[in-house]
């Protein structure tokens, strides 16, 4: 089997999945504030790739509500963590997204 070099450009999410670059806490937008009393602070990330959308019963696709470049809030334990080189990413289902920022 030949080795495959993975990069952001080679990752294509399927269905309603979204590939998100995790934002380091120091790079989060300053307009976001999570109080110290919050037990689990949501994670912030930028959409870098999208799936085609969820398939409806009639076979058509339901378009995703997010687009590449959007900043998202998502639960700390949602999705599947992926590391490409030194960068951290997470593969989320659209239902795991809490909100868009901005």
Curated annotation (Swiss-Prot):
Describe its function.
Together with the chaperonin GroEL, plays an essential role in assisting protein folding. The GroEL-GroES system forms a nano-cage that allows encapsulation of the non-native substrate proteins and provides a physical environment optimized to promote and accelerate protein folding. GroES binds to the apical surface of the GroEL ring, thereby capping the opening of the GroEL channel.
Which gene is annotated as encoding this protein in its UniProt record?
A: groES
- Keyword Chaperone present in the record's keywords: the answer is yes
Q: What name does the UniProt record give this protein?
A: Co-chaperonin GroES
Where does this protein come from, organism-wise? Anabaena sp. (strain L31)
Subcellular location(s): the record lists: Cytoplasm
- A single GO molecular function term of this UniProt record: unfolded protein binding
Q: How does it assemble?
A: Heptamer of 7 subunits arranged in a ring. Interacts with the chaperonin GroEL.
Its predominant location is cytoplasm
Q: GO terms for biological process?
A: chaperone cofactor-dependent protein refolding
Q: Which InterPro entries match?
A: Chaperonin_GroES (IPR020818), Chaperonin_GroES_sf (IPR037124), GroES-like_sf (IPR011032)
* Family under the similarity heading: Belongs to the GroES chaperonin family.
């Amino acid at each position: 089997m030949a080795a495959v070099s993975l990069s952001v450009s080679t990752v294509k999410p399927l269905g309603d999945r979204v590939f998100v670059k995790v934002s380091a806490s120091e790079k989060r937008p300053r307009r976001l504030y999570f109080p110290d009393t919050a037990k689990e602070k949501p994670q912030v990330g930028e959409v870098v790739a999208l799936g085609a959308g969820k398939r409806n019963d009639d076979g058509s696709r339901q378009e995703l509500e997010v687009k590449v470049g959007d900043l998202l809030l998502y639960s700390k334990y949602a999705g599947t963590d992926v590391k490409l080189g030194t960068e951290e990413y997470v593969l989320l289902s659209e239902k795991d997204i809490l909100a868009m920022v901005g």
